[in-house]
Design a protein with these regions (language model features):
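Conserved N-terminal phosphate-binding loop of PLP-dependent enzymes in the Aspartate aminotransferase
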Residues: 1-207
Length: 207
């Protein structure tokens, strides 16, 4: 969950849900709008758990900032979607689809997802250091890949506001979590700079 505070499912829970869906003939719908398209370090986050959904929603990253979304499904799940059953006034916009194709070309380039994983490990290591350095400010690090969350002991809005004053744009989420969603092509030097700004923010707010 992104809005819920970067809450990750466990492998056991996901396998249980997949099994329940199989046993009852229920479709498993996976929302990859925030965590998909490489943000987790794999093309789709569910790949980390070897779980295959029946329906999957994707958006945000697929458009690279351009409004675009898609719904993917297995053949069995889409059997009722015959011609005329689904449509939208501006669906299939040629410009949006061209942008999406170019985004996919970049994400699928050799080394792109590997770099996301590498930067994720580096970023997480640096932020765990911040947790140790500022125990009165930070409580927990959450997330996968470059979809990370810092649970704060102070009000998360106070943290994001002070970060904004330091020219760092962060997003608050539920459970008093600050979301950190850097671009997937972030460099090691840029990670260091973000951590520097996080440290300055924490210094301003620590008790």
């Amino acid at each position: 969950q992104g809005e819920g505070g970067i809450r990750s499912f466990s492998l056991e829970i996901l396998k249980l849900i997949r099994g329940l869906c199989d046993d009852t003939g229920t479709l498993l719908i996976v929302d990859e709008i925030q965590c998909g398209l490489g943000r987790s370090g794999k093309l789709f986050a569910h790949e980390w758990f070897n779980i295959n959904p029946d329906i999957m929603t994707i958006a945000k990253g697929i458009g690279g900032g351009f409004p675009l979304g898609a719904c993917l499904s297995t053949k069995n799940a889409s059997i009722g979607m015959v011609k005329g059953k689904h449509g939208s006034t501006y669906g299939g916009n040629p410009l949006a689809c061209a942008v999406g194709c170019e985004v996919m070309n970049n994400v699928l380039e050799d080394g792109f997802l590997e770099n996301v994983e590498m930067m994720s490990r580096y970023f997480s290591q640096k932020m765990l250091g911040l947790l140790s350095e500022f125990p009165s400010v930070f409580e927990e690090l959450r997330g996968y890949g470059l979809m990370l969350g810092l649970k704060t002991k102070i009000e998360n809005i106070s943290f994001t506001n002070e970060a904004f004053n330091q020219n760092l744009l962060l997003a608050p989420a539920s459970d008093n979590v600050v979301r950190i969603l850097p671009p997937l092509n972030i460099t090691k030097q840029e990670v260091d700079y973000v951590v520097k700004l996080l440290r300055k923010t924490a210094q301003r707010l620590e008790n």
